[in-house]
C-alpha cells in the first residue's frame, strides 16, 4: 500500500531544496508526494518540475511590512488556516512534514488540529518563531544543527539535506593534494547577491600583488551582474563573473576557498563538500541566526567567521594573502568531519517510521 506525505516548504531555496531532496528519497521508496506551497512561490515551479502533486495557499512573510498588513494579519491567517485544512482533508496524508517557509506554519497548525502525524525540520541553529510554536505540537522535531531545539523526547539531529552530487565529492585531502599556483576563490552571494561582498571583494583583490592574486569566480545575483562588472573594472581585477551557478558541486570541488554568507543550507553544503570558507553572516538576519550557523564551522577551525562590520578591503586582502594551502586543506578536512551526509535519509526514514507508530 502506497503512503502519502504532504511536504510544506516555500519562500527560499534554503527551505525548498532540502524538501525536494527528501521528496525524491521518499518517491524512490514508493511514496506519493504532495507539496504545499504558496501561490507564485519558487516552490511551485520546482515541485512541478520534479513531478510532484502541488497544492497552494495564499500567505506570505510579514517582517518589515506596513501597518495595514499587520492589521490584516488575523484575517490572512484565518484564510491560510482554512485553505491548509481543506488541503489536508483532500490529500489525507499519512505524514505531514514542515520544512519551513510561509506555508509551514498554517499547514503545521492544521495538521496538528486534524490529528495528522506532524514532523518539522529546523534548518537553522536558532529556530524562528513559527518552529518554536510548532515544536510544541509536532510529533518529531528534526534538526539541521545540534541543540537548535532542546527536547529529549522529540528532537532528532539529522543535519540539513543537501544535493547528492555534493556529498559524493572526493575527500578534501585528495582534492587539495598536489594543487599549486594561485588559489581558486569562489565568492557566492546567493540568488539575490550580497552587496557587501560585491563591493568589498574586488577592492580587496586590487590590494593583492597580481602574482599572488587568487583566481576568482564571483556569483553576483540575478540583478547585480552589471554593477559587479563595474566594480571589478574599476579595481582593475579580472574574474569570472556570473549571475548564477548551475553546478555548485563542481564549483565547490575545484575551489580552494569560498567567501559567502552563512545561511543554514550554505553552511551544510560547505561541510558536505569539505571546502575552506570565510563566512560573512548577513547582519540583519532574524535573531542573527547566520552568525550562530557560522560558528558551527568556525568553532571547530573549519571556517573563518568575519562579521560584516569588520569586512574591509584592507583586512580581507591581508587575510587572503596570509592563508597557506596547508591551512586551507586543514580547514576543508575539518569541515568534512562536521558533515551529515545521511541527512536526507535521516529525515525521510524518520517520516517513514511515523507510519508504523
Swiss-Prot record:
Pfam family name, one: Glyco_tran_28_C
What is the species of this protein? Answer: Nitrosospira multiformis (strain ATCC 25196 / NCIMB 11849 / C 71)
> What is its membrane topology?
Peripheral membrane protein
Point out the signal peptide segment. none
What gene name is listed for this protein? murG
Q: Name one GO molecular function term.
A: undecaprenyldiphospho-muramoylpentapeptide beta-N-acetylglucosaminyltransferase activity
Q: What is its main location?
A: membrane
Keyword Thylakoid, does the record have it? no
Q: Which reaction does it catalyse?
A: di-trans,octa-cis-undecaprenyl diphospho-N-acetyl-alpha-D-muramoyl-L-alanyl-D-glutamyl-meso-2,6-diaminopimeloyl-D-alanyl-D-alanine + UDP-N-acetyl-alpha-D-glucosamine = di-trans,octa-cis-undecaprenyl diphospho-[N-acetyl-alpha-D-glucosaminyl-(1->4)]-N-acetyl-alpha-D-muramoyl-L-alanyl-D-glutamyl-meso-2,6-diaminopimeloyl-D-alanyl-D-alanine + UDP + H(+)
Q: What is its EC number?
A: 2.4.1.227
BP term (GO), one: lipid glycosylation
Q: What top-tier enzyme class does this entry carry?
A: transferase
Note the InterPro entries from the entry.
Answer: GlcNAc_MurG, Glyco_trans_28_C, GlycoTrans_28_N
Q: Which CDD domains match?
A: GT28_MurG
The protein depicted here goes by the name UDP-N-acetylglucosamine--N-acetylmuramyl-(pentapeptide) pyrophosphoryl-undecaprenol N-acetylglucosamine transferase
Amino acid at each position: 500500500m502506497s503512503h502519502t506525505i504532504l511536504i510544506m516548504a516555500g519562500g527560499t531555496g534554503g527551505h525548498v531544496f532540502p524538501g525536494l531532496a527528501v521528496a525524491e528519497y521518499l518517491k524512490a521508496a514508493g511514496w506519493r508526494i504532495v507539496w504545499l506551497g504558496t501561490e507564485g512561490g519558487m516552490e511551485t515551479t520546482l515541485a512541478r518540475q520534479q513531478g510532484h502533486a502541488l497544492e497552494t495557499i495564499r500567505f506570505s512573510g510579514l517582517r518589515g511590512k506596513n501597518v495595514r498588513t499587520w492589521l490584516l494579519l488575523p484575517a490572512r491567517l484565518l484564510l491560510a488556516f482554512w485553505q491548509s485544512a481543506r488541503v489536508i482533508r483532500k490529500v489525507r496524508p499519512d505524514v505531514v512534514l514542515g520544512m519551513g517557509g510561509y506555508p509551514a506554519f498554517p499547514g503545521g497548525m492544521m495538521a496538528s488540529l486534524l490529528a495528522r502525524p506532524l514532523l518539522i525540520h529546523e534548518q537553522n541553529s536558532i529556530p524562528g518563531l513559527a518552529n518554536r510554536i510548532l515544536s510544541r505540537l509536532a510529533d518529531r522535531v528534526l534538526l539541521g544543527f545540534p541543540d537548535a531545539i532542546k527536547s529529549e523526547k522529540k528532537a532528532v539531529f539529522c543535519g540539513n539535506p543537501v544535493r547528492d552530487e555534493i556529498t559524493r565529492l572526493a575527500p578534501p585531502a585528495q582534492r587539495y593534494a598536489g594543487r599549486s599556483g594561485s588559489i581558486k576563490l569562489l565568492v557566492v552571494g546567493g540568488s539575490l547577491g550580497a552587496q557587501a561582498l560585491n563591493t568589498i571583494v574586488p577592492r580587496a583583490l586590487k590590494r593583492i600583488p597580481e602574482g599572488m592574486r587568487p583566481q576568482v569566480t564571483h556569483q553576483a545575483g540575478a540583478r547585480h551582474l552589471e554593477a559587479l562588472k563595474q566594480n571589478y573594472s574599476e579595481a582593475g581585477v579580472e574574474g569570472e563573473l556570473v549571475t548564477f551557478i548551475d553546478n555548485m558541486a563542481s564549483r565547490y570541488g575545484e575551489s580552494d576557498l569560498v567567501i559567502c554568507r552563512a545561511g543554514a543550507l550554505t553552511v551544510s553544503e560547505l561541510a558536505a563538500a569539505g571546502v575552506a570558507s570565510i563566512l560573512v553572516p548577513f547582519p540583519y538576519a532574524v535573531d542573527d541566526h547566520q552568525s550562530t550557523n557560522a560558528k558551527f564551522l568556525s568553532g571547530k577551525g573549519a571556517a573563518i567567521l568575519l562579521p560584516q562590520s569588520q569586512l574591509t578591503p584592507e583586512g580581507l586582502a591581508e587575510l587572503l594573502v596570509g592563508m597557506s594551502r596547508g591551512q586551507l586543506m586543514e580547514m576543508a578536512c575539518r569541515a568534512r568531519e562536521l558533515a551529515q551526509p545521511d541527512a536526507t535519509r535521516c529525515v525521510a526514514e524518520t517520516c517513514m517510521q511515523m507510519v508504523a507508530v
